[in-house]
Swiss-Prot record:
Disulfide bonds: C51-C66, C58-C73, C65-C80
Record protein name field: Mu-theraphotoxin-Hhn1d
GO MF entries: ion channel inhibitor activity; sodium channel regulator activity; toxin activity
Tissue-by-tissue expression: Expressed by the venom gland.
Annotated family: Belongs to the neurotoxin 10 (Hwtx-1) family. 22 (Htx-4) subfamily.
Length: 86
């Protein structure tokens, strides 16, 4: 009786370890996949847009704000702001 209980508990412990290991592998795989997708997305954003976003510091003589997004470099405050009315 004691031996069968010991074997049953050992079997349950082994099952728990195997399930936990496979679950952690799945999580690691999904985390790696997600991070690789986000890394590719970040790289493509950097290649597409070489301009600054709203509220970023800029130099009025070399306007790096995105004209397509109606952003201009403020000469007074030296940061990218929306150009309203044009």
């Amino acid at each position: 009786m004691k031996a069968s209980m010991f074997l049953a508990l050992a079997g349950l412990a082994l099952l728990f370890v195997v399930c936990y290991a496979s679950e952690s592998e799945e999580k690691e795989f999904s985390n790696e996949l997600l991070s690789s997708v986000l890394a590719v997305d970040d790289n493509s954003k950097g290649e597409e847009r070489e301009c600054l976003g709203f509220g970023k510091g800029c130099n009025p003589s070399s306007d790096q704000c995105c004209k397509s997004s109606n952003l201009v470099c403020s000469r007074k405050h030296r940061w990218c702001k929306y150009e309203i009315g044009k």
